[in-house]
UniProtKB/Swiss-Prot annotation:
Lineage: Bacteria, Pseudomonadati, Pseudomonadota, Gammaproteobacteria, Pseudomonadales
GO biological process: coenzyme A biosynthetic process
Family: Belongs to the bacterial CoaD family.
Pfam families tied to this protein: CTP_transf_like (PF01467)
Name of this protein: Phosphopantetheine adenylyltransferase
Subcellular location: Cytoplasm
Protein encoded by which gene: coaD
Entry keywords, A to Z: ATP-binding, Coenzyme A biosynthesis, Cytoplasm, Magnesium, Nucleotide-binding, Nucleotidyltransferase, Transferase
Entry's EC annotation: 2.7.7.3
Role according to the record: Reversibly transfers an adenylyl group from ATP to 4'-phosphopantetheine, yielding dephospho-CoA (dPCoA) and pyrophosphate.
Catalytic activity entry: (R)-4'-phosphopantetheine + ATP + H(+) = 3'-dephospho-CoA + diphosphate
Quaternary assembly: Homohexamer.
Source superkingdom: Bacteria
Binding locations of ATP: T9, F10, H17, G88, L89, R90, E98, Y123, S124, F125, I126, S127, S128, T129
Length: 159
């Protein structure tokens, strides 16, 4: 059985992330969205809320589960019995970092392969950072995130 781990901070989860998960759910038996605590990134939403939002966005996919974690990704992959890391590449600028990360993960978890997917064209420009920035300034984010995420951001930045 192929069990893929899709790690990230997901602060917040976007339609781009959701697109990757939907496509992965057709390619793999099981998809685990691994929401990283990432305290050094000082996330906008607490881990529990990011996990809940990811669950809401993916609840229609029966072979997808969402789990929060705060350990080394290689260790978490072993705990989850994952055999693939899934990463998204929006642009060439993402590749160098992701390539370095994949090589490090290969050293730490040699039995887990790294697989890169590019986003659908309509989502290739979306990033959590840009979504947060637009929301902070009161812009319309509904084209970029699930309604539950838009609601959470609206509540967070009420003026």
């Amino acid at each position: 059985m192929n069990r893929v781990l899709y790690p990230g901070t997901f602060d917040p989860i976007t339609k781009g992330h959701g697109d990757l998960v939907e496509r992965a759910s057709r390619l793999f038996d099981q998809v685990v969205i691994a929401v990283a605590a990432s305290p050094k990134k000082n996330p906008l939403f607490p881990l529990e809320q990011r996990v809940e939002l990811a669950r809401e966005v993916t609840k229609h996919l029966p072979n997808v589960e969402v789990v929060g974690f705060s350990t080394l990704l290689a260790h978490f992959a072993k705990e989850q019995n994952a055999n693939v890391f899934l990463r998204g590449l929006r642009a060439v600028s993402d590749f160098e970092y992701e390539f370095q990360l994949a090589n490090m993960n290969r050293q730490l978890a040699p039995d887990v392969e790294s697989l890169f997917l590019t986003p659908s064209e309509r989502y290739s420009f979306i990033s959590s950072t840009l979504v947060r920035e637009i929301a902070t300034l009161g812009g319309d984010i509904t084209k970029f995130v699930h309604p539950a995420v838009a609601q959470a951001l609206t509540e967070r930045f009420k003026r």
